[in-house]
Design a protein with these regions (language model features):
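Actinobacteria-biased recognition of intrinsically disordered, low-complexity terminal regions
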Residues: 1-2
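A structural signal for multi-pass alpha-helical bundles of membrane permease subunits
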Residues: 6-8, 12-281
């Protein structure tokens, strides 16, 4: 019986594996083409017969990127924005998720529903109101105009996701900690925080990518002070409508991708366990 069951499963398993492989190829091909174009000479990039390989790889595009005067500044600004968003949103989301899970108060369910509704509002619909808000707050042309909106948009998802991790921690564990003399602060940071850390990593990945790749807010809120621009804005330096430098665009995009890949490599184990744990709720 088991043998027949295995034989019936093989075609479906093979079809699933082939489908997964095809999806992986489709997803990875643009990344491969970006890196390939970054190493191609200008003549091959502009050729009317594109080829998925190059016989004469060149570092000229990367040289132009790093010789661009403000590129290092853009990189540092992106790092400051992304790290600030990750740290602040993770801490606030952890405390908020604990509050809405452990405490009983009026409008608690309404608040949770509002977290869900907030995720349905497109960012583009709020860009103009946010522009006037940042103008009135004196935050235009500052990194604060990028950090604050990203924190606001990342918190609903982070709180809702972390709520499942906090809920999975038995209340008996909290009671035992209090019986042993632990304060609420000690329980939060020494017991609960390590237990929900995989969830924090998972939410931090989404927050980091959103802040790192942001172009809309950077273009809308950084108007005149280019020293406050981020890496996505650096692509405009190489893209000119009359004479686009596609090699520079692809090289800059490749450099932009490296920190994200490093971040994924460092947190991949925690990320998998975090996404797996999020399914429980």
């Amino acid at each position: 019986m088991n043998l027949i069951h295995r034989q019936l499963r093989r075609p479906w398993r093979l079809a699933a594996e082939v489908s997964a492989l095809l999806i992986a190829v489709v997803v990875a091909f643009p990344l491969y083409w970006m890196v390939l174009s970054a190493f191609k000479p200008a003549g091959e990039i502009e050729s009317s017969e594109p080829r998925p390989w190059t016989l004469s790889p060149s570092l000229d595009s990367f040289r132009r990127v790093f010789e661009q005067q403000e590129f290092g500044r853009y990189f540092l600004n992106s790092l400051v924005v992304a790290c600030s968003v990750v740290i602040v949103s993770a801490l606030v989301a952890f405390l908020a998720a604990t509050a809405v899970t452990r405490f009983r108060f009026r409008f608690r369910t309404t608040l949770l529903i509002m977290f869900l509704v907030a995720q349905m509002v497109p960012v583009e619909a709020l860009t103009i109101p946010l522009f006037f808000l940042m103008r009135d707050a004196g935050q235009l042309n500052t990194l604060g105009s990028l950090i604050l909106p990203h924190i606001a948009f990342s918190l609903p998802f982070a709180i809702w996701m972390l709520r499942g991790f906090v809920k999975a921690v038995p209340e008996a564990l909290e009671e035992a900690a209090y019986i042993d003399g632990a304060s609420r602060a000690r329980f939060l940071w020494q017991i609960l925080f390590p237990l929900v850390f995989p969830g924090l990593v998972a939410t931090s990945v989404f927050s980091f990518i959103s802040a790192w790749n942001d172009f809309l807010f950077a273009k809308s809120f950084i108007i005149s002070d280019t020293s406050q621009s981020t890496l996505p804005m650096a692509l405009l330096v190489f893209y000119k409508p009359d004479d686009p430098d596609w090699g520079g665009v692809m090289a800059a995009s490749t450099v932009m991708t490296i920190p994200v890949l490093i971040f994924f490599v460092l947190v991949q184990r925690r990320l998998v366990s975090g996404l797996g744990g999020a399914v429980k709720d």
